């Protein structure tokens, strides 16, 4: 069992914690989060970005983690970046709390996301269905409101 965590901060009021858990390299990874400071009753893009570099804020995290050179897509799509996690919903207070499992996100092995950055975006991810080049690259999810480098944790 491997556990990892990212503490999200940014230039906005958005902040939170994202936790990752994987039993073994061939198992799905559970991702859970509690994130505050978003707009109320919204959907916000949620992605793993390539670099664990936040020296220039969330911008230096680079593009979505995409080791297979695919187009952007929804988490359930075969054509997607490894780092495409779709949208997280917020409640009436702008809080998002939830979990999902994903077969492409790995904490173990050569495609590990440990040391990369998780990002919450300012807008809704169109899941690559927006009909333009940017949709196929970023999902038109907008600015990077908060981010954190993913590191190994003890629980």
From Swiss-Prot:
Q: State which Enzyme Commission number(s) the record gives.
A: 1.15.1.1
List the disulfide bonds in this chain: 58-147
Q: Which residues bind Cu cation?
A: 47, 49, 64, 121
Instruction: Give UniProt keywords alphabetically.
Output: Antioxidant, Copper, Cytoplasm, Disulfide bond, Metal-binding, Oxidoreductase, Zinc
Coarsely, its chief localization is cytoplasm
Q: Which domain of life is it from?
A: Eukaryota
Q: What does this protein do?
A: Destroys radicals which are normally produced within the cells and which are toxic to biological systems.
Q: What is this protein called?
A: Superoxide dismutase [Cu-Zn]
Read off the lineage from the record: Eukaryota, Fungi, Dikarya, Ascomycota, Saccharomycotina
Give the gene symbol: SOD1
